[in-house]
Amino acid sequence: MSSNVSQLHANDAVKGLLAKMLPGAVQSAENSAQKTKQKQKGSKAQLIDRNLKRRVQLQELDVEKLKKKQSRIRRRDLQKQRRGQEEIKQLAELEVLERHRKEGKLTKKETKHLNRLVNVNAERAKSWELDEDEKEDLLELQKYILEKTTSANRVAKSQKRRQKKKTFNDNKKGVSASMARRYPGLTPGLAPVDMSDEEESSEEEEEVEMKE
């Protein structure tokens, strides 16, 4: 304690001596010390201010990221809702087309519509950002449509073949009936004995024309 008091006295004595010999030197030293302290305080205040501004900027960035994320979620939900409505509509249309197919009433226009549905879903799968469950649902829908389209095409071709066969058989029956009227008692498939080659050729041409 005594040493500290002695040091203070010594400092005061030095300051007093300097004040007598160099007026203003002590005041300048004290001013410099105050300025140094003020600068230190100013630096700390600036540092705190910079940190606060940085924190505000980070918070604003977080808010912006949150807004973008929420916007993506809303957009994705709307897309899911729209896709769900479209799929329900398509399934309803496919049920009608399937009923027409079973009844043999599927038209060319309906077949084209099925093909269009396949193409639309293929393009949609490329353009949408789908998760695994959505991709699986879309693939199942495409498979269902393709099965209906293939089945419808087979039915249409089968109906066309049956119609051609029926027309051919009707024409054949007409020719046989004509021959029976002209040549009573003739065995089916045989020409009469006294028929000339020219007449036989004429009959064959007539039969070919009726087939066509």
From Swiss-Prot:
The Acidic residues compositionally biased stretches are: 195-212
Q: Where is this region: Disordered?
A: 26-49, 152-212
What keyword terms does UniProt attach to this protein?
A: Nucleus, Transcription, Transcription regulation
Which family would the database say this protein is a member of? Belongs to the RRT14 family.
Signal peptide positions (record): none
Q: What does this protein do?
A: Involved in ribosome biogenesis, probably through modulation of rDNA transcription.
A Pfam family the protein falls into: RRT14
- Places the protein is found: Nucleus, Nucleolus
Q: What name does the UniProt record give this protein?
A: Regulator of rDNA transcription 14
Q: Which cysteines are joined by disulfide bonds?
A: none
Origin organism of this chain? Zygosaccharomyces rouxii (strain ATCC 2623 / CBS 732 / NBRC 1130 / NCYC 568 / NRRL Y-229)
**Keyword presence, Transcription:** yes
Q: Which InterPro entries match?
A: Rrt14
Q: Any one cellular component term from GO for this entry?
A: nucleolus
Per UniProt, the ranges with Basic residues bias are 157-166
Q: What is the gene called?
A: RRT14
